[in-house]
Each structure stands twice: as C-alpha cells, then as structure tokens.
Amino acid sequence: MTVSRLLKDRVRYAPYLKKVKPVEELIPLFKDGQYIGWSGFTGVGAPKAVPEALIKHVEENNLQGKLRFNLFVGASAGPEECKWAEHDMILRRAPHQVGKPIAKAINDGRIQFFDKHLSMFPQDLTYGYYSRNRTDGKILDYTIIEATAIKEDGSIVPGPSVGGSPEFISVSDKIIIEVNTATPSFEGLHDIDMPVNPPFRQPYPYTAVDQKNGLDSIPVDPERVVAVVESTQRDVVGPNTPSDATSQSIARHLVEFFENEVRHGRLPENLHPLQSGIGNIANAVIEGLTDSSFKNLTVWTEVLQDSFLDLFENGALDYATATSIRLTEAGFQKFFDNWDDFSKKLCLRSQVVSNNPELIRRLGVIAMNTPVEVDIYAHANSTNVSGSRMLNGLGGSADFLRNAKLSIMHAPAARPTKTDPTGISTIVPMASHVDQTEHDLDVLVTDQGLADLRGLSPRERAREIIKNCAHPDYQPILTDYLDRSEHYAKLHKCMHEPHMLKNAFKFHLNLSEKGTMKVDNWD
C-alpha cells in the first residue's frame, strides 16, 4: 500500500510503516460481541476511519443488530458512536455518552448502559471488573486510538484528548492506530501517567496546576499493534450554546460570591483552580470571569471550551490542565494560529489524573457543575429525568463536587414545557434520583440568586434554597410543602429532614399528567 507523505512525516517509528493498511482490510478482525476501546473524550480525539468503515460494512450487508460491540470510551465520543447506535451496533456502553440516537437506544432498552465516576472508570476496567464474565481472560479485544504523531520509540502522541487511552492500551489484546493527518500534531502538550495497580501505586506528585511529571506520549508494545490507518477527518464540534440573560444572571451571582469570599479572606485574590463543565451556563461563568477583575487564574478541569481561550488572551488565565480540549472549528483555528503561546499554558492529562479526588482536594479546586434538579435539602440529580430517563451519564461531576474546596451547582430556576414557560422547577421537594448528596454541595446558584449552604442544617438549607434559588412561581408552593412537612414531622418527632412521602414526588407526577410542576395543592 502506498503511504502518503503526510503519514510518513507523522510516523517516525519505521516498523509501523509496514503495518499501514487500507481501512477496508480491517473489517474481518471485528466479530459480534467483542469488547472494544476507543480513544476520545467529550467528542474530540476519537477514532473516525475504522468506525465509519464498520458502519458502511453493516449497511451494505444488512448486519444491523448482528454485529454489536461492548464499547468503552473515556467519556463521550464523536458522531460515530451515534451512528453505531442508529445501526444497532452497540450492545453495552460506558461510562458517558452524548447524542440523541444513543440516548434513545439506551432509554428504549436496546443498549445496556452504565455510568461511572470518570476518575474510576479506566482503572476499574483494568481490574477486569467489566469483563469478568469472559472465559478467555481478555479485557479488551481491540483498542482503536487516534494519534497525531508516532514517536521514534513507537509511542503514541494523542490529539486533543487523552481520556482513558493509557489504560485501554495497557489491557488491550490488539491495538489499531489511526493517525490523523488532517489535524496538526499535538506533540508536547500531554503529560501521561501510565496505570499502576495497587499495591504498587504511588501518589501522583502534582502540587500545582502547571507541574508535569509524566510522559509526553503513550507507550505501547509494538507487537500488539496490528494496523496503522491514516485518518483525514478533523473533529467536528458544533457551535457553543451562547449565553443568555438567565445564564448571565447566574454568572453575576457567582462572580459576586467569589468577590465576597476574597474580601473575607476565604479565597485568595486569584481564587483557587477552577473546574467548569460544558454548556451555556459554564460559558457564561467563564465570560463573567473574563469581564471581572480576577487575574492570574488557573484551571484544573476535564474539558476546555472556546471561552477559556478568551481568558488566556486577556491575560486573566495563567495555566490550565484538562483531559480534553473541546473546541469549535473557529476555536481550534485560533488555538493552532497561536500554538506557541497557548501550548506553554496548557497541559492534557489522563482522566484518572484530571479527575483524581486526592489531587482535586490537594489543589483546593472550585468545582462548578449543572444538575437536572436539586431538592430543598440539596440532594442533586445530574443524570435521570424524572428518575428514569437517562440523559448523558454522571461524568466527572461527583469526582469534583465530593472533593472540591468549594462545590457549586448552577442551573436556571425554571425551564419551559410545551404548555408552560416555567413548567419545570429545578428546585423540587425530593430529587427523583440522587447523584450528589446533601453532604457534597456548598453553594447552589440559579438566575434568582445564590444559596450558601455551608454549615446549615437541612431545614435551614431548605429555607435558604427556596428563598434564594427557587423561581417565584414555585416559592409559595415549596414553602407550603416545607411547612406541612415540618408540621407532620413535629408530631412524629422526626424534625431533622422533614418530608411528606405521599407528596414528595407530586411535582414529577403533575408534570407527567398536566405538563407542569405547579401543583394545585398538597392535599
């Protein structure tokens, strides 16, 4: 097979050039029921050529539902996993996904999905937890990993994400490398800690966001590399959801809170390392920090979006660590155009490091994430709408919220339904599913205001949340629920965290039956 000049330039380990194959030749390697690992995290850095070739093979041979895989990715992959779901090619999936087709297949019961703390998922996979029913002793049959270069020793330089790739490679029977020549090489941007299992594991030595102590590429046994494929497709990330009045209001409340914490000496003037999720609220918060007086900020997070580039450019952000750079096309272009500047201020690490609870606690990270709903006592649901319908998965929110110095959740106070512009209240009497407990949250923010929950008893928290965070349409309804619950609990001497269990999920039932959470009464 003829090897392109671009591929020769990227593959500096000569023996791999003999393993370059057209993607079509790899199809016979894949069998129904295999355990497959992909590189990628939050839609970037995932393989493209091999998954697309398998989709074409399934289409042309009517193999929908007959060629299905147990698919493991560090978090969400690119659009290819949604196409796999549409073609009934996924038997089992973990630990996080994004996209309507795959979520539909999960909620239709066609895909067995489990979510897991992202800091734990790769290591648990290496322990054999997810392949314990296999009789051949293998963990993964194949790992398909995207590289932007291969070094002289055969090690792999990832692209815009690291995720769980080091762990997948360490336990994979065979490895296929997709070298993406459509994107520039990311060499020099990574700091890779290879997995070491207990009892031989040592502490991660990082005491500052900008410290590096690992490798700049992922080692691999060349004997296990069965093929190298050239990929010529860049990551496609849709435009970021722009901030709006609601998200900007949330950002203002948060910036004011940070300023107050600095005035009272509970935070330094440059805060502590920031962690922020994705979405329009997260973007608005970063925009708010861009416009604020805070300087010399640092970031220790999972994912960097376009808005962080603005923080770099205005001089407010000194350094950022993540496991993924999820940029739009314009964002990536800006990133590559300013490579010499940005690359000095950025490090991509494995997700077991970026999400490591001990490091998050050591560094004093300020964590900010968006829930589906939060109840009056500060239990948060991040995953299951009305307790049952899976959205994306837990992700890394609990890694950060359980261990951060400041654990913050932010959301609009109300969301629309088809018949009611404020038909869904983010604040509910009892969360229909709990991912983060009352013991994990310090601060709750909506467009209505901010509730500082530190040191408050459950009943104090409830009053603070209803007063400061609930939408005005729901404040009297929630207050009535709390008053009645306290009256009932006082009679039965159970005043610590009062509830009326017969009415605890009346918001959700009313939403299902009438299209709004605005209950008429609690009788």
Swiss-Prot record:
Extract one GO BP annotation from the record: acetate metabolic process
Which branch of life, at top level? Eukaryota
| GO terms of molecular function | acetate CoA-transferase activity; acetyl-CoA hydrolase activity
Family stated for the protein in its record: Belongs to the acetyl-CoA hydrolase/transferase family.
| Any one cellular-component term (Gene Ontology) | mitochondrion
Look up keyword Ligase and say if it applies.
no
Q: What is its EC number?
A: 3.1.2.1
* Protein function: Presumably involved in regulating the intracellular acetyl-CoA pool for fatty acid and cholesterol synthesis and fatty acid oxidation.
The subcellular location is: Cytoplasm
Query: What UniProt keywords are attached to this protein's entry?
Result: Cytoplasm, Hydrolase
Provide the protein name.
Acetyl-CoA hydrolase
Active-site residues per Swiss-Prot or TrEMBL entry: E302 (5-glutamyl coenzyme a thioester intermediate)
| Residues given in the record as CoA binding sites | G277, I278, G279, N280, I281, N392, G396
- Which lineage do the record's taxonomy fields give for this organism? Eukaryota, Fungi, Dikarya, Ascomycota, Saccharomycotina
Source organism (scientific name) = Kluyveromyces lactis (strain ATCC 8585 / CBS 2359 / DSM 70799 / NBRC 1267 / NRRL Y-1140 / WM37)
Q: Which reaction(s) does the protein catalyse, per the Swiss-Prot or TrEMBL entry?
A: acetyl-CoA + H2O = acetate + CoA + H(+)
User: What Pfam families is this protein classified in?
Assistant: AcetylCoA_hyd_C, AcetylCoA_hydro
